[in-house]
Amino acid sequence: GHVSQYQEVSERCSSPAAMAADERDYNLTEEQKAVKAKYPPLNKKYECELHAWGDTLEEAFEQCVMAMFGYMTDTETVEPVDTVEVEAEGHDMLSLLFHFLDEWLYKFSANEFFIPREVKVLYIDRMQFKIRSIGWGEEFSLPKHPQGTEVKAITYSAMQICEDEKPEVFVIIDI
């Protein structure tokens, strides 16, 4: 089977499981509660952290887009019937990642309601901070595609691009 290279940080996101976990909090001791609170203070109701990685930075960027759309619907239900190209530019790598995700989000929110099944980054220009990508997918439609969480905005909050052993990115989105 295909192993997806992004993880949903469910304990930090608003999902039925997270809400159920909140209700179970009263069973925790004070000590357990203290341990539980040792990750960045995300507001579970309004924020979600995307964490994606790959063998290359291009792949990490691709996976980050798919992680974002993974909150909006089950991307496994999407068929690659249409092709969409997305380009973006920034003034550094973080702003490039921000605008890249924002452009993909715009493809969904601006009348097209496009959801990709797969995204391929054609190139990242690290000198000019430009990116070109292509996505295969289709228009979002109920009941074919389950409705997940609405992604309202990309944020710069705690955004990271790490390129040590394996390239990985961390992005917080408003939901």
What are these regions (language model features)?
Residues 3-175:
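Intrinsically disordered, low-complexity regions
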